[in-house]
């Protein structure tokens, strides 16, 4: 009965005419930030922008040079029914010029490079999340005993998941499949693919609605890559295809097209540095360990879930690749910018993809992987940042934001190392620390 009432509440929401408008953007971490203005200022927000102080936004300017302007993108307007306000994404400017560290602007610039080649990227994400009962401590309370695709033992979680899906269309998302994931209290709601910029917006919107609905029910939802040691981590597999003149250019006859293979080649070539964007937290590397279906070996294959890149289909409009290492702590604008930049680089340079595998990579011994030329992803955020420093192409994707990003993330890594040292915890620990929970639980 409670479940039915919850669903009815979501369906019957009456959305009054919004009197306030949320101007929303992300910081360098991908966390949602914003300010509200009266709806009467909407046109001003589009035409002239609204100024704000960026000095306290993670990854933005210091206090000595922090005057920024938000300009609304009216194509992103939506209404948030549980708050009764409007919401719009946009771009950040510094004076009359696009601000170098604006994540959405970074992706836009990479997409303009694709467009010069006549290409558009379609991307479908699969973000996973956990739902925990609030109890005021870091002793995370698991509210259900379900497993993969289970239909029993879900109690409140099932109601929350359905209510999330019912709210999603208000924000422009089209839910496709809802199901329980492998971990207890772990869930996934897949939504329809879209062009790259809209997909990045949708990921931000999805995380917003998931957290908000869980909160309405007295629960926490977290997209933290590995909230509990020994439990499956939260991934965000990305299904990617490129289109030209309305045709999917990944389609081949007996396999993927050369364009698709070179795109894969570019990703594999830069995968180590790319990890700094697709897996940008200390906690990300607690997920990327063997045994949990999270890829650690740089390889690719057809329908092979142990590979870093899987090819689910190569015929028809559904021809695509699946990049399996990203997690939902990534800033989606930066992650997609990096992936598309290195993929385009692979196409231009005709990079052939090595490390093709048909069998389970995890079951190979070191000698077999070495024979096949299979390398590994970085084992920590620190290693990923060192790879990023050496990779010109991934740095180029970030553009002027590279310094902001590397400085911010190096401080993050240093703080973690200091925490471990102060408690005599080994630097290579795979246990989830309280430092990580405090820093990443709300990503």
UniProtKB/Swiss-Prot annotation:
Cofactor note: Binds 2 Mg(2+) or Mn(2+) ions per subunit.
Domain GS catalytic: 103-443
Activity sensitivity to pH: Optimum pH is 7.8 for the synthetase reaction and pH 7.2 for the transferase reaction.
Cofactor section: Mg(2+); Mn(2+)
Example of a GO MF term: glutamine synthetase activity
Regulation: The activity of this enzyme is not controlled by adenylation.
Keyword Flavoprotein tagged: no
Subcellular location(s) per record: Cytoplasm
Binding-site positions, Mg(2+) 1: 126, 237, 322
GO CC annotations on file: cytoplasm
Thermal dependence of function as given in the entry: Optimum temperature is 60 degrees Celsius for both transferase and synthetase activities.
Cross-referenced SUPFAM superfamilies: Glutamine synthetase, N-terminal domain, Glutamine synthetase/guanido kinase
Record's keyword annotation contains Repeat: no
PANTHER family per record: GAMMA-GLUTAMYLPUTRESCINE SYNTHETASE, TYPE-1 GLUTAMINE SYNTHETASE 2
Reported function: Carries out the ATP-dependent synthesis of glutamine from ammonium nitrogen and glutamate. Exhibits both L-gamma-glutamylhydroxamate synthetase and gamma-glutamyltransferase activities when using hydroxylamine as substrate; in fact, the enzyme possesses low biosynthetic activity, suggesting that the reaction is biased towards the degradation of glutamine under ammonia-rich conditions. Might play some role in ammonia assimilation under ammonia-starvation conditions. Can also use GTP instead of ATP in the synthetase reaction, but not CTP or UTP.
Identification of the protein by name: Glutamine synthetase
Organism listed in the record: Thermococcus kodakarensis (strain ATCC BAA-918 / JCM 12380 / KOD1) (Pyrococcus kodakaraensis (strain KOD1))
């Amino acid at each position: 009965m409670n479940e039915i009432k919850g669903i009815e509440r979501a369906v019957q929401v009456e959305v009054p005419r919004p009197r306030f408008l949320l101007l929303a953007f992300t910081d360098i971490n991908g966390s949602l930030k914003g300010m509200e203005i009266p709806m009467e200022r909407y046109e001003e927000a589009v035409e002239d922008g609204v100024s704000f102080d960026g000095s306290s936004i993670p990854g933005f300017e210091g206090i000595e040079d922090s005057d920024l302007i938000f300009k609304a993108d009216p194509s992103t307007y939506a209404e948030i029914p549980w708050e009764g306000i409007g919401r719009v994404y946009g771009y950040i400017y510094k004076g009359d010029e696009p601000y170098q560290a604006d994540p959405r602007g970074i992706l836009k610039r990479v997409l303009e490079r694709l467009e010069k080649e006549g290409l558009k990227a379609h991307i479908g994400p699969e973000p996973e999340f956990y739902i925990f009962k609030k109890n005021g401590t870091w002793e995370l309370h698991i509210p259900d005993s379900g497993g993969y695709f289970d239909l029993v033992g879900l109690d409140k979680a099932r109601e929350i998941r359905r209510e999330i899906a019912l709210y999603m269309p208000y924000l422009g998302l089209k839910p496709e499949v809802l199901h329980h994931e492998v971990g207890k209290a772990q869930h996934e709601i897949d939504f329809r693919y879209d062009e790259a910029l809209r997909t990045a917006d949708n990921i931000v919107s999805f995380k917003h609605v998931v957290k908000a609905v869980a909160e309405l029910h007295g629960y926490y939802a977290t997209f933290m890559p590995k909230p509990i040691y020994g439990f499956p981590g939260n991934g965000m597999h990305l299904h990617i295809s490129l289109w030209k003149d309305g045709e999917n250019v990944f389609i081949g006859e007996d396999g993927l097209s050369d364009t698709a293979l070179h795109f894969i080649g570019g990703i594999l070539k830069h995968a180590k540095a790319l990890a700094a964007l697709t897996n940008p937290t200390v906690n990300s590397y607690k997920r990327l360990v063997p045994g949990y279906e999270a890829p650690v070996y740089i390889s690719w294959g057809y329908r092979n879930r142990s590979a870093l890149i899987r090819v689910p289909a190569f015929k028809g409009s559904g021809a695509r690749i699946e990049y399996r290492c990203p997690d939902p702590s990534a800033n989606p604008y930066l992650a997609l910018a990096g992936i598309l930049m290195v993929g385009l680089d692979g196409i231009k340079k005709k990079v052939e993809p090595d490390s093709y595998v048909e069998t389970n990579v995890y079951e190979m011994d070191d000698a077999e992987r070495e024979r096949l030329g299979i390398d590994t992803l970085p084992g920590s955020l620190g290693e990923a940042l060192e790879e990023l420093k050496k990779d010109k192409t991934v740095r180029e994707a970030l553009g002027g934001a590279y310094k902001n990003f590397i400085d911010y993330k190096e401080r993050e890594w240093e703080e973690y190392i200091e925490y471990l040292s102060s408690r005599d915890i080994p630097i290579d620990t795979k246990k989830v620390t309280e430092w990580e929970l405090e820093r990443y639980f709300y990503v």
